[in-house]
Amino acid sequence: YLTGMRMGGQRVLILVDSSASMLGRTYANVVRYRAMPDERKVRAPKWRQTLGTVEWLTTQIQPGARFQIYAFNEQAATTVAGSDGGWITAKDGSDFDAALAGLRKIVPTKGTSLIKAFQAARAMKPTPDNIFLITDGLPTQGASAPAEPEPIRADRRANFLRQASAELPANVPVNVILLPMEGDPEAAIRFWDLAMRTRGSFLAPARDWP
């Protein structure tokens, strides 16, 4: 579903979920891919769609604008070494190529701490004027990972999203691109709500998009 995707911006931040769940659309697929070698993991259809989505977004950024790509699981970091907290000017295609090449080196793993991604967004100077969030469901942890793996109930995951949202920089639209995960029925409505509250947009694309 597409509700007026808000493109444009002079400081565009793309946040990419790189947790283990981005390997599959069902828990069974995630478990199967997690047992595979890394070179197979990065060819998982859902992760390839994620990479294609980021590449498509970069084609919408105007020359001269600034951008940044952060990948996040239990931590958040830029895909261009040494550029954390700063912006990259879109002078020519090589700027995007470097950021995308860094993203392609990432192998999805670990849990999802959305609060880390939103804290990174708030720490950027100057702050973003447009954020794109690519994820597949509600976060599985808050600011710190649990000492031992544990099942996380839906209400706790919703609370992790509320905690993360409180860290967002003020008055910045969040455009959510959701690649839904089986067994997380609340994700769509809660991320739609986040997008609407921030005057962003929400998209749950078909598997062959973009």
Where in this protein do the model-derived segments appear?
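Extracytoplasmic
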Residues: 7-13, 19, 51-52, 62-67, ...
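Von Willebrand factor
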Residues: 1-7, 18-22, 26-36, 51, 87-128, 132, 139, 189-192, ...
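VWA/integrin I-like adhesion module and closely mimicked acidic/polar interface patches used
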Residues: 137-197, 203-205
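Extracytoplasmic/secreted envelope proteins and their assembly/folding machinery
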Residues: 9, 47, 51-58, 96-103, ...
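Structural recognition of the beta-strand scaffold that forms the well-ordered cores
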Residues: 13-15, 68-71, 132-133, 173-178, ...
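Solvent-exposed loop/turn segments at secondary-structure junctions
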Residues: 18-22, 73-78, 108-111, 127, ...
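…and closely analogous acidic/polar surface helices at protein-protein or active-site interfaces
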Residues: 22-69, 85-95, 107
